[in-house]
Structures are given as structure tokens and as C-alpha cells.
């Protein structure tokens, strides 16, 4: 398993984060088998959120590991997210604290290794967030903190009040959905890719040692589904298939390797409930695409080079 340094923590963590959004339909036995399959391949970093399957992803995960003496809490890194409620966002102090208590109860653990603010809340008071973080840290309920889907100035506003390091920012990123890369190359151009939609978040995170966690790594723009095997991205799939044959791996592995090749040292967040596909994503850790291969995939997705 390839390792990356997690923010300013200095901790070496797996490059592949096991996203648990789609695990809510598993039963206790199949969840236990899935956890073992991940951990045995070095993917012991699990990403949850309180809203995934209405909390069932966390609930079943907790049931699956707590009664298994071969799965020790200290051998897993558990991350979860809070702040999304039905029809609105809520990063109030009280709701953050309430959410964490619920997460801990469902996951059957006394602490989270990492808590992320799931999405920016227009009504969030950063001083309240700071109070919540202090309480959670001092109580031992949360060890590290990060954000998800936040722009640089939103993080800067938090950092004005929050004492703890913002360790991660979870952002959507795939070969087709890579404006934060395109924006950095189509500088001084009148092109779609030149539009700065995220405040140069890629460069900001690299400058501030914030680890980017790439979610939906196989997603097309506008949540239209997976690009692998999709005729809308025929040129991209042709190039992916060519490289998959060259490296003797699956197309999934090549698409994941494209993300891991970026020098920002991102983590890739999986979204699969399939042990086979999880293994294909983990296989990307042993593929090191060269520059020409990386750019050919980028261009095949419809991006341009000025």
C-alpha cells in the first residue's frame, strides 16, 4: 500500500481511503468480511458520514468490528463527517457535538481519528465551530479535524478561530472532473478550464500541507454516473483500456492511478461495496504513470493544453 503524509500530522496513512457511503445495505457478516478484505490489503483508513444510509453504514460497521477480536480499534483509522441535515446544513456548536456523539455510538468507538465538516454552512459561525472543536479535542472524542468541499477562503475563515490544524479537504476529483488542475494550466486563457471555480484550492492545499482526499474518483461531471465504459467518454476509455492492457491491470486501476500520480500526494476515497473493485483500486498504488501517459488521459477526457 502506498502511503501519504496526512497533512501536518506527520502520520503516514494509506493512499486509498475506504469510503463507506454504499455499505449500508450489507449485513453484519458481509460488512465484517469487507473490513477484513480492506485491512488485509493495507487499506485500514475508513471514511464515514453520519448521513450515509441514514446512519446505517456506521451502525453496521460498528456491529461488524466490535465483536471480532481480530479487528482491533487501534489498527483502524476511522473518519466521519457531519453538518448535513434533511433540507439544510448545520455546523452549529450543538449540532456538531450531537452528531459526534451519535457517530461514536454507531461506530462503537470512544473516539474518531478524524472529523470533517461535510459541506460549508452559510450560517456557520466559525467561533462556534472552534468551541465545538475544543470540546471534542479536550474530551478525547476527536483527535484530528478537517473539512470537505471547502474553498481556501472558507478554510482561512475557520483558521482565524480554530486552534487545531485543518488536516484534510475532501474534494471531488476524477479525470473528467479536474477543473482544479485545468485552471492551473489554462492561465490567461478565455476557455472553460480557465474559470476559477474553487479559489485555487489545489495550490492552496499544497502550500498549507492540507491533504486532498479525492471523492467520486470515477464520476463524470454533474453526477451523471461512472465514466468507465461510458460511450460519452469513448476516447478516454480507449486510452484507459490501452494502458490497462499495457500494465496488465483493470481500467479501474488506471483511472485511480491517474489521481495518485499527481504530486499533491492525494488520497483517493473509494465508493464501492465490491471487494473485487476495492482490490482494483488498491492495485493503483503499484502503477506509476509517466508524464506522457498522464497527459494523454487528461486530454482524452476532453481537456485542452493551451
Predicted regions and their residues:
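Short, acidic/polar
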Residues: 26-38, 91-107, 153-157
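Beta/alpha (TIM)-barrel catalytic core signal, keyed to glycine-rich beta->alpha loops juxtaposed to Asp/Glu
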Residues: 120, 124-306
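A structural motif
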Residues: 43, 109-112, 142, 166
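N-terminal binding-site loop/beta-alpha segment at the start of enzyme catalytic domains
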Residues: 1-76, 138
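Structural motif corresponding to the early beta-alpha repeats
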Residues: 71-94, 118-119
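Short catalytic-loop micro-motif centered on adjacent basic/acidic residues
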Residues: 45-52, 116-117, 143-146
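Acidic-and-aromatic substrate-binding clefts and catalytic sites of carbohydrate-active enzymes
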Residues: 23-29, 49-59, 85-90, 121-125, ...
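Active-site groove signature of glycoside hydrolases
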Residues: 104-125
Amino acid at each position: 500500500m502506498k502511503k501519504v503524509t496526512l497533512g501536518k500530522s506527520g502520520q503516514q496513512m494509506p493512499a486509498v481511503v475506504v469510503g463507506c457511503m454504499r455499505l449500508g445495505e450489507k449485513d453484519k457478516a458481509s460488512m465484517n468480511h469487507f473490513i477484513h478484505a480492506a485491512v488485509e490489503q493495507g487499506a485500514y483508513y475508513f471514511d464515514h458520514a453520519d448521513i450515509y444510509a441514514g446512519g446505517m453504514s456506521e451502525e453496521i460497521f460498528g456491529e461488524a468490528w466490535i465483536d471480532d477480536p481480530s479487528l482491533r480499534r487501534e489498527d483502524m483509522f476511522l473518519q466521519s463527517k457531519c453538518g448535513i441535515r434533511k433540507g439544510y446544513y448545520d455546523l452549529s456548536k450543538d449540532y456538531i457535538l450531537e452528531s459526534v456523539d451519535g457517530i461514536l455510538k454507531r461506530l462503537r468507538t470512544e473516539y474518531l481519528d478524524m472529523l470533517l465538516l461535510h459541506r460549508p454552512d452559510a450560517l456557520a459561525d466559525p467561533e462556534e465551530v472552534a468551541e465545538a472543536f475544543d470540546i471534542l479535542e479536550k474530551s478525547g472524542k476527536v483527535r484530528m479535524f478537517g473539512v470537505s468541499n471547502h474553498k481556501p477562503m472558507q478554510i482561512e475563515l475557520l483558521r482565524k478561530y480554530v486552534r487545531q490544524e485543518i488536516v484534510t479537504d475532501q474534494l471531488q476529483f476524477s479525470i473528467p472532473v479536474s477543473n482544479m488542475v485545468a485552471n492551473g494550466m489554462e492561465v490567461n486563457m478565455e476557455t472553460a478550464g480557465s474559470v476559477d471555480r474553487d479559489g485555487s484550492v489545489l495550490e492552496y492545499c499544497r502550500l498549507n500541507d492540507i491533504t486532498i482526499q479525492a471523492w467520486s474518483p470515477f464520476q463524470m461531471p454533474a453526477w451523471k454516473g461512472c465514466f468507465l465504459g461510458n460511450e460519452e467518454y469513448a476516447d478516454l476509455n480507449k486510452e484507459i483500456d490501452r494502458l490497462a492492457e499495457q500494465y496488465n491491470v483493470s481500467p479501474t486501476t488506471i483511472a485511480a492511478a491517474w489521481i495518485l500520480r499527481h504530486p499533491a500526494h492525494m488520497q483517493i476515497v473509494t465508493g464501492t461495496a465490491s471487494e473485487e473493485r476495492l482490490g482494483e483500486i488498491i492495485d493503483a498504488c503499484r502503477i506509476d504513470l509517466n508524464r506522457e501517459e498522464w497527459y494523454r488521459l487528461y486530454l482524452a477526457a476532453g481537456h485542452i493544453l493551451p
